Structures are given as structure tokens and as C-alpha cells.
Curated annotation (Swiss-Prot):
GO molecular-function term, one example from the UniProt record: dGTPase activity
Lineage start: Bacteria, Pseudomonadati, Pseudomonadota, Alphaproteobacteria, Rickettsiales
NCBIfam families tied to this protein: dGTP_triPase, PRK01286.1-1, PRK01286.1-5
Gene3D superfamilies assigned: Hypothetical protein af1432
Superkingdom, natural source: Bacteria
Family of this protein: Belongs to the dGTPase family. Type 2 subfamily.
InterPro entries on file: dGTPase, dGTPase-like, dNTPase_2, HD/PDEase_dom, HD_domain, PHydrolase_assoc_dom
Protein name: Deoxyguanosinetriphosphate triphosphohydrolase-like protein
Length: 384
């Protein structure tokens, strides 16, 4: 049974374009299925999480596997708190749809290209994909998701109080997402499920890729404690099994902490309805202070030891060159764009041209971006 402060699909604020409900799925389940059927969702399997799959190996996480892992964590947490697991799962599945090829490196490169044209943000791009760029229905652009899902995608990291992305502001005029308030508890869960998944699994993939080793992990005292206890209990544990056990324990402890602190917050604030969650002065779903410190420490470790390692910097330089090279060549000659993209440009106006090109590049997979660069630019990048 859903809590009184949960997002109830029967009480959804609805869709921008009215539709007849289905009897065999609730509204959030319907949205989940629509997201899974999008082209953007399928393309995530060929987009980088940290390591470029076709270069580094087939077993590293990509944006699709990451999104699935986030969704499983979000669903479990929401279920335990008597919230809508369908909504939490749906937001989690959609949270990275707007990512460029080559992960955050690609996003940074594209944002630099777009600095004169209001920049680029993968979060805002997710909204644009789901409300405009996906063309699957005759009656409207996008996939016509419920208000609660769109709110969660835009605001899962918190209220938008500063500068508002151009497309978000434009969309908000026709479908007010209440940008200055917190999103639902389910959306907040999706956000922290993302943190849980990416720090634990980036550690795992980095060990497997030999970017870091167990000596490096000793820099994180709590991880070093895990290692000591596991080696004491399992004398002959293999390195591969050791990292899996570490990650399993880390995920379990993070989820447990999140549940306990969130229950405490709900009790302390005497929350009785969803509007109280939205209008609260802080995020109701959270970790304890100690665990937040551990998470921040782990993020700093990953940046220092992994994302800013010599190997990753070398890859980043090449990926940046590909994204920025493609942007420049399309800006110089729009006839190189596919016809269905070229016709979206408003009379060859520079701003419109840049936005369409950014949308096109953002939708590319790693592999397609490399192929396009090889075909249109020199020298060739047969490998990253």
C-alpha cells in the first residue's frame, strides 16, 4: 500500500496531450514502457559510462547497463518506503537519455562548442528528447509522459533556482513543472540511486581495467576496512571476487543508510502528503551526514585516480577532438547533415543551426561518432 505522501498513479496530474488510460498498466508503468521503446534508450548501450566498450572490452558498463542498475536500486528503495516503485524506476531509466557520446567528456566538449548558444546540458537534453525529438506518434512530438515523470527527470537533482536552460524554460511555459520546488520523493530516490550505482560500479570497473589497484583503494579507509574483514574471513579470496564482495557490501550499506535516514526525516517532518515534500526546505530523501562524507570522499578519489588518470586524459583529448571536430565541420557545411536533420534548421540561421547540430551530435553513439569523424575529418581515429 502506498504511503500518503507517495506519488499515486491514480492521482497523476496527467499528460500534456490527454489519452485514454489502459486497464492493464498504471500511468507510470506506461511511461516506463514508452521510455524503454525509444530510440534514445536503445542507443545508451553504445554510449560510454567511463570506459569505451568497443575499445576497452565488452564487460565494462555503458550508459544502458548503468541506467538499469540505477533503476533496480531506485525500485528497491521506493518499495521499502511504500513509495511508487514504478515512478522511481521510470525516472531512473530516463535520467541519462540526454547523454552525449563519450560520457561526461563528450558533454563537456559539446557544451564548450555551444557556449555562444546557451550551452548544452544532458539533463535538459533528456527532457528535449522525451518531449520533442523522439518521433513515434502521429498526433504529437515526443512520447507524452506524465507530469510526474517529466518533473522527476528535470528536478531529480533538486529545485532549479538559478539560470534555467532555454529548452526547459520554453517547455515549462506550456507545462509548469514547478521548477522552484523539490521533486517527488521518488525522483529524489532516483537521484541518490544514481550516486550509489556510479560510485560503486566505477570502482569495480576501474579495478578490472587496472586503472587502480587494491593499494589505491586503501586510500579510502572504509573500503580498506572492507578488504581487511573479507581477507580475514576468506583467506584465499581471488582479486576478482574481492572487488565484487566490496561493491556488494558498499551498495548494501549505502541503501541501508539511505532508508534509515529518509525514514527519520519523514518522521521528524511529520510528512503526510506529497506537497509537503515538494515545499520542504531540504531534500527529504538523503543519507546520514557520515555517509554523505564517505560518498564525497569516494567521488574525489574517483576523480583523482580514475577520471583524471593519464590513460583517461589521453582518451578524453581524443574524444573531445572528435566531438568538437564534428561540430565545426557541420557548422561549416550543413549539407553534411542527414536531410531529416537539415530541414529542422531555421533558414540557415546560426543559432538554430548550432542547436540542431548539438541535438544531432548528442544523439550519436560512441561508435557512430568515431565513424563520422573518420569519414569527414582527418587524421582518422580507428581507435580511441
Amino acid at each position: 500500500m502506498l504511503a500518503s505522501y507517495a506519488s499515486d498513479p491514480l492521482k497523476s496530474r496527467g499528460r500534456l496531450y490527454k489519452e485514454i488510460p489502459t486497464y492493464y498498466r498504471n500511468e507510470f508503468e506506461r511511461d516506463r514502457d514508452r521510455i524503454i521503446h525509444t530510440n534514445a534508450f536503445r542507443r545508451l548501450q553504445y554510449k560510454t559510462q567511463v570506459f569505451i566498450n568497443h575499445e576497452e572490452g565488452d564487460h565494462y558498463r555503458n550508459r544502458l547497463t548503468h541506467s538499469l542498475e540505477v533503476a533496480t536500486v531506485a525500485r528497491s528503495v521506493a518499495n521499502t518506503l511504500n513509495l511508487s516503485s514504478d515512478l522511481a524506476e521510470t525516472i531512473a531509466l530516463a535520467h541519462d537519455l540526454g547523454h552525449t557520446p563519450f560520457g561526461h567528456v563528450g558533454e563537456k566538449a559539446l557544451n564548450e562548442c555551444m557556449k555562444e548558444y546557451n550551452g548544452f546540458s544532458h539533463n535538459s537534453q533528456s527532457l528535449k528528447i522525451l518531449t520533442l525529438l523522439e518521433k513515434r506518434y502521429a498526433a504529437y512530438n515526443g512520447v507524452n509522459l506524465t507530469w510526474e515523470v517529466l518533473e522527476g527527470i528535470v528536478k531529480h537533482n533538486g529545485p532549479i533556482l538559478g539560470a534555467i536552460n532555454e529548452y526547459v524554460a520554453e517547455y515549462n511555459k506550456q507545462n509548469d513543472l514547478e521548477l522552484n520546488t523539490y521533486a517527488s520523493a521518488e525522483a529524489q530516490i532516483a537521484s541518490l540511486a544514481d550516486d550509489i550505482s556510479y560510485i560503486s560500479h566505477d570502482l569495480e570497473d576501474s579495478i578490472i581495467a587496472k586503472i587502480i589497484d587494491f593499494n589505491n583503494l586503501a586510500e579510502l579507509q572504509y573500503i580498506d576496512n572492507y578488504v581487511f574483514k573479507l581477507k580475514s574471513k576468506f583467506k584465499d579470496i581471488s582479486p576478482s571476487c574481492l572487488i565484487y564482495e566490496i561493491v556488494r557490501k558498499l551498495i548494501h550499506e549505502l541503501i541501508t543508510d539511505l532508508l534509515l535516514q529518509t525514514k527519520e526525516n519523514l518522521k521528524k517532518e511529520k510528512i503526510t502528503n506529497i506537497n509537503e515534500i515538494r515545499n520542504l526546505h531540504y531534500q527529504i530523501v538523503d543519507f546520514t551526514e557520515k555517509t554523505n562524507e564517505r560518498i564525497n570522499e569516494t567521488k574525489k578519489f574517483l576523480h583523482k585516480r580514475v577520471y583524471e588518470s593519464n590513460k583517461m586524459i589521453a582518451i578524453s583529448i581524443k574524444c573531445t577532438k572528435i566531438v568538437q571536430g564534428l561540430f565545426k565541420i557541420y557548422m561549416d557545411d550543413i549539407n553534411l547533415l542527414p536531410t531529416n536533420w537539415k530541414i529542422l534548421i531555421d533558414s540557415n540561421e546560426t543559432y538554430s543551426k548550432a542547436r540542431v547540430i548539438a541535438d544531432y551530435i548528442a544523439g550519436m553513439t560512441d561508435r557512430f561518432a568515431i565513424q563520422e569523424y573518420n569519414q569527414l575529418c582527418a587524421p582518422k581515429f580507428n581507435k580511441i
